[in-house]
């Protein structure tokens, strides 16, 4: 079992740093509680070994990034984590009870809409524990409180301490926020640990239910009726979970909108490839940084849409922000349109692609100005009208 624990720690270290972080925290928390209960130093040493295995895997996964940083210098702009995000995306207990907007029950979906219309801080909207998950969480809380009231501290489930720690650490304004105020803002989205709470409570409920079943059935023999009732209860629970957790399917109208967008993007890209030389570079407007830098009217990664269907075109969007290689793009915004286009052509770009959603007046002034500059070759326009490509070629 010791080697299994080491292996689990190492595998966790290979995954997203959020879950490496919580594994190490909960492992150390469990070791401290067990040491307090049993005064066992081997427990502490085992926990430290698991944490060391996770740390070793974390180092292995990030070694290339760190060596690149040593060779090329730090990139302070690549991953910006401001303190405000720790407050906005912190874990909120009430959000564990708020169903998604896509819930199959119109009553619950309406409750979610009403909540989101007035709530000042909205997280990533994925903290809902579900009916069964909430029942297990409340059951765990009841067992823990009852044990404390009866002065049976040793009987408080370890899982209760783990959930309590997650809440204290990652809730809005919690210990993670204190660390953030001191400058450590890496773990900005404490709400993501809601899935860990669900996993802990469900596993505890299964173990607790199995223990109760063994106690009730000790010395008894189940007859067919009892087995049938148990099976029916399990099936009913599964049906509730599926109904509660699987979102309402999109309507035909919603599917049709997505299909039109996909078909439009695919056809638009095919027209660009037919009109431009193989390997041509396309400068995309509005100028956006990557990653996580949206502009009004566009999501952060809208510029990737043509890339999904391209075979031989190259695009200006997608280089990691913070490095000097692409700083010239941001400088274009300080120049006149004529100077900016001249610089774009000088760097070898064959066309300008405009997402009209990212501009006031749907970018019509820019398109008119380009035509006035002599780029009057017929533009390539997507079927949905939001994308337009203007070749930088004068007749």
Annotate each PLM feature.
Residues 10-19, 172:
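Transmembrane helix irregularities
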Residues 1-10:
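Short hydrophobic alpha-helices at membrane interfaces in multi-pass membrane enzymes
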Residues 76-81, 110-131, 152-203, 319, ...:
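Membrane-helix boundary/interfacial segments in multi-pass membrane proteins
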Residues 61-141:
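Periplasmic/ER-lumenal interhelical loops and adjacent helix-loop junctions
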Residues 74, 236-395:
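Extracytoplasmic
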Residues 1, 26-35, 136-147, 160-163, ...:
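Transmembrane alpha-helices and membrane-interface helical segments
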Residues 28, 48-55, 203, 208-245:
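Signature aromatic-anchored transmembrane alpha helix within multi-pass, membrane-resident enzymes
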Residues 22-55:
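Perimembrane helix-loop-helix junctions
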């Amino acid at each position: 079992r010791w080697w299994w624990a080491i292996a689990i720690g190492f595998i966790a270290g290979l995954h997203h740093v959020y879950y490496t972080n919580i594994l190490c925290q909960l492992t150390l928390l469990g070791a401290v509680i067990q040491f307090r209960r049993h005064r066992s130093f081997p427990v502490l040493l085992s926990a430290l070994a698991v944490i060391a295995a996770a740390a070793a895997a974390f180092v292995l996964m990030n070694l290339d990034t760190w060596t690149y940083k040593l060779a090329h210098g730090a990139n302070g702009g690549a991953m910006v984590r401001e303190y405000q995000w720790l407050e906005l995306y912190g874990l909120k207990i009430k959000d564990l009870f708020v169903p998604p907007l896509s819930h199959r029950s119109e009553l619950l979906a309406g409750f979610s809409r009403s909540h989101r219309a007035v709530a000042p801080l909205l997280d990533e909207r994925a903290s809902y524990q579900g009916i069964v998950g909430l029942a297990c969480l409340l059951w765990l809380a009841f067992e823990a409180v009852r044990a404390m009231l009866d002065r049976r501290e040793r009987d408080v489930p370890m899982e209760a301490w783990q959930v309590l720690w997650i809440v204290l650490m990652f809730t809005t304004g919690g210990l993670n926020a204190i660390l953030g105020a001191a400058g450590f803002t890496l773990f900005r989205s404490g709400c993501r640990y809601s899935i860990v709470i669900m996993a802990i409570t469900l596993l505890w409920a299964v173990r607790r239910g199995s223990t109760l079943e063994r106690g009730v059935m000790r010395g008894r023999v189940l007859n067919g009726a009892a087995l049938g009732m148990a099976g029916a209860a399990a099936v009913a629970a599964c049906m509730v979970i599926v109904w509660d957790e699987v979102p309402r399917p999109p309507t035909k109208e919603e599917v049709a909108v997505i299909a039109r967008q996909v078909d439009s993007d695919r056809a638009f890209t095919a027209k660009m490839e037919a009109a431009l030389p193989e390997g041509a570079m396309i400068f995309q407007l509005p100028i956006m940084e990557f990653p996580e830098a949206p502009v009004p009217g566009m999501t952060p990664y809208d510029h990737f849409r043509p890339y999904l269907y391209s075979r031989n075109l190259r695009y200006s969007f997608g280089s990691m922000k913070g490095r000097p290689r692409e700083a010239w793009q941001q400088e274009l915004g300080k120049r006149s349109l004529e100077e900016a286009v001249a610089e774009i052509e000088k760097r070898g770009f064959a066309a300008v692609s405009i997402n009209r959603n990212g501009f006031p007046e749907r970018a019509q002034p820019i398109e008119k100005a380009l035509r006035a500059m002599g780029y009057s070759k017929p533009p390539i326009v997507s079927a949905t009208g939001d994308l337009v490509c203007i070749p930088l070629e004068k007749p």
